[in-house]
């Protein structure tokens, strides 16, 4: 990144995105923070995101948008619960109070509103606030990226795609960060199963910027969803030098790489990626994305019959402190995978019980509202599967399978729960469940022809003489 390109007060104003501060230094550091967020990369020459935020708040302690981006990025990281983190709760409260006492632009007030909504678990309302900004300010990258992340957590694939479609024509290739609009739009296309267009748009982004880790990520998804394992392996190897510098997405891209090996039944190769990259980066970053990837990878391997118990125990040291966070159901379900895999019954029980308590009195928090009818029964199904009660797992998951999108994440990420349902049905001693497994596999084969993983499961079903 080129510090000389970061905008001062006048440059922000010239772009129609005035910031309520007189500090040019604060404005430039705001731009530096935003650029690193958009590019999935902590630039150590700038001090990384944390360093830029710290310097920005020193340059102007009363800069509302500086506090908004700081709180917003911590919140969308989903690693801190407002219920449990008094410092974060205080930061959000001070942001709202500071905004109330200043003369801000309507755009800035909407940003504060979006952060406050997200902090309180009102994710849909947060996205509405960011979309309101984009009606008048379609080149507000912070609103674009926060809405993109918000829709992702909500599992709202079509709004995630359309949010970018609405603003893209307002940008030109000469505007900094333009390629990242291509990559975000391509991901929305992929998640709405427009695979050809998604690949085309993502590769346009990569042509402009080979270090666009999110564009590479979209192509990885396309190959996964088409069951193009060899193409996926070749693509990841050929682009690794570009995206491995994006520390906030690199581990996730290695996770995608490993999925191709799991699909092919090459488990040792998958474990090598886990040990050399996924787990190493997870321990270094402590990020939720890196953690849930590691959880998911081990769970998939375990369902394939691979012994990963020792790795579960190591991973539990990362996930256990977040057992009672309950920020996202998606995170909770993945942390439960590791607690169960490590045979930590007390941790597993505590996670499910505390989630149940929140589900009984969810208030305005959307995730807690969804917990009662979605998150808790999914957790109970995982516990039942772990205890060998496969029939119960089927009965819990079967009514929910078309609602899995509600936990957020991508189709590729949520497929672990579809796989869990298939394995549960195959292992159940009830013939109707085994017949249901056959139907599920027919569905999988129709949606992703030539999937080696599906073929292995079909062979297992054939052995049952269903």
Question: What is the meaning of each model-derived region?
Answer:
Residues 45-49, 88, 126, 160, ...:
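Single-residue signature of alpha-solenoid repeat helices
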Residues 22, 27, 35-54, 58-105, ...:
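Inter-helical turn/loop elements of alpha-helical hairpins
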Residues 66, 109, 142-143, 177, ...:
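TPR alpha-solenoid repeat register
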Residues 39-40, 77, 120-121, 154, ...:
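Structural motif corresponding to the intra-repeat A-B loop/turn of tetratricopeptide repeats
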């Amino acid at each position: 990144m080129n510090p000389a390109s970061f905008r001062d007060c006048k440059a922000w104003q010239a772009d129609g995105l005035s910031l309520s501060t007189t500090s040019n230094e604060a404005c430039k550091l705001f731009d530096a923070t935003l650029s690193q967020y958009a590019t999935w990369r902590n630039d150590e020459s700038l001090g990384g995101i944390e360093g830029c935020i710290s310097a920005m708040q020193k340059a102007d302690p009363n800069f509302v948008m500086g506090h908004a981006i700081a709180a917003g990025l911590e919140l969308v990281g989903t690693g801190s619960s407002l219920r449990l983190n008094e410092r974060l709760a205080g930061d959000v409260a001070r942001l709202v109070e500071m905004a109330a006492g200043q003369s801000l632009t309507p755009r800035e007030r909407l940003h504060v509103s979006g952060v406050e909504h997200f902090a309180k678990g009102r994710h849909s309302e947060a996205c509405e606030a960011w979309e309101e900004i984009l009606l008048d300010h379609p080149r507000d990258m912070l609103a674009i990226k926060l809405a993109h992340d918000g829709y992702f957590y909500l599992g709202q694939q079509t709004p995630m795609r359309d949010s970018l479609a609405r603003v893209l024509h307002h940008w030109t290739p000469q505007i900094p960060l333009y390629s990242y609009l291509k990559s975000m739009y391509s991901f929305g296309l992929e998640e709405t199963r427009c695979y050809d267009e998604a690949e085309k748009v993502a590769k346009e982004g990569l042509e402009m910027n080979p270090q666009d880790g999110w564009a590479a990520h979209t192509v990885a998804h396309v190959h996964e969803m088409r069951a193009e394992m060899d193409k996926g392996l070749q693509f990841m190897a050929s682009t690794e030098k570009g995206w491995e510098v994006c520390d906030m997405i690199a581990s996730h891209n290695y996770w995608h790489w490993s999925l191709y090996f799991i699909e092919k039944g090459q488990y040792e190769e998958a474990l090598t990626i886990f040990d050399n990259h996924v787990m190493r980066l997870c321990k270094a970053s402590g990020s939720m994305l890196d953690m849930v990837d590691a959880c998911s990878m081990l769970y998939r391997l375990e369902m394939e019959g691979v012994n990963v118990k020792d790795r579960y125990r190591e991973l539990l040291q990362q996930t256990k402190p977040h057992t009672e966070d309950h920020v996202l159901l998606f995170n909770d379900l993945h942390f439960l995978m590791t607690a169960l895999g490590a045979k930590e019954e007390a941790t597993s029980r505590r996670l499910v019980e505390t989630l149940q308590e929140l589900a009984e009195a969810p208030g305005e928090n959307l995730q807690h509202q969804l917990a009662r009818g979605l998150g808790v029964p999914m957790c109970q199904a995982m516990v039942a599967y772990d205890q060998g009660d496969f029939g119960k797992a089927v009965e819990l998951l079967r009514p929910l399978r078309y609602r899995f999108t509600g936990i957020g994440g991508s189709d590729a990420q949520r497929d672990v729960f579809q796989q869990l349902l298939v394995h549960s049905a195959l292992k159940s001693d009830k013939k109707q469940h085994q017949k249901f497994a056959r139907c599920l596999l027919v569905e999988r084969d129709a949606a992703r022809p030539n999937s080696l993983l599906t073929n292995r499961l079909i062979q297992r079903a054939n052995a049952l003489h269903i």
